[in-house]
Amino acid sequence: MNLNELQPAAGSRHVRNRVGRGTSSGNGKTSGRGQKGQKARGKVRLGFEGGQMPLYRRIPKRGFTNISRKEFAVVNLNKLNSFDDGTEITPTLLIENGIVKNQKSGIKILAVGQLEKKLTVKAHKFSAAAVAAIEQAGGSTEVL
C-alpha cells in the first residue's frame, strides 16, 4: 500500500447536494420542495404549527422572574483542604486561587466532603452543616 492508494472509508465522505441547478440533477426546478404552497415558498417561523394555536401559547403562563434574586457562588468544604492550617479564607483569597471564578451576590459555603484543616472562613452565607463541620475541625466561621 502506498500513500497515493489511500482512500476514505466507504460512506464517510458526502457530496453536498446543490438544489435548483437544472432538472437533470434530480433536484432542479422545485428543489425538492414539492409543488406550490406555504412550505414551497419562504421559511416558516420557529414554533409555527400551520395556524393551529402553538404549544407555547396553549400552555398556561406560570411564575415570574424575581428582579431582586440573589445568586451565590458555591464553595464545597473539600475544596478548602488545599489551604494550609490556620489560614484565614476570604472571598478575595478564593478568587485569587481559582476556586471561585465569579463571586456573583456573594459566596456560600456548603458541607460537601470532609474538612481536615483548621481554618477561619469568612463568607456571605454558610449552610448549618458546613458551620458544624468547620467548628468540628477546630476552625471558625464569620458571616460578612
Curated annotation (Swiss-Prot):
The keyword Ribosomal protein applies. One of its GO terms (biological process) is translation. Keywords: Ribonucleoprotein, Ribosomal protein, RNA-binding, rRNA-binding. Residues 23-35 have a biased composition (Gly residues). It comes from the Bacteria. GO terms for cellular component: cytosolic large ribosomal subunit. Residues 1-44 are annotated as: Disordered. InterPro entries: Ribosomal_uL15, Ribosomal_uL15/eL18, Ribosomal_uL15/eL18_sf, Ribosomal_uL15_bac-type, Ribosomal_uL15_CS. Pfam families: Ribosomal_L27A. SUPFAM superfamilies: Ribosomal proteins L15p and L18e (SSF52080). One of its GO terms (molecular function) is rRNA binding. Part of the 50S ribosomal subunit. Belongs to the universal ribosomal protein uL15 family. PANTHER family: 50S RIBOSOMAL PROTEIN L15, LARGE RIBOSOMAL SUBUNIT PROTEIN UL15M. This is Large ribosomal subunit protein uL15. It comes from Leuconostoc mesenteroides subsp. mesenteroides (strain ATCC 8293 / DSM 20343 / BCRC 11652 / CCM 1803 / JCM 6124 / NCDO 523 / NBRC 100496 / NCIMB 8023 / NCTC 12954 / NRRL B-1118 / 37Y).
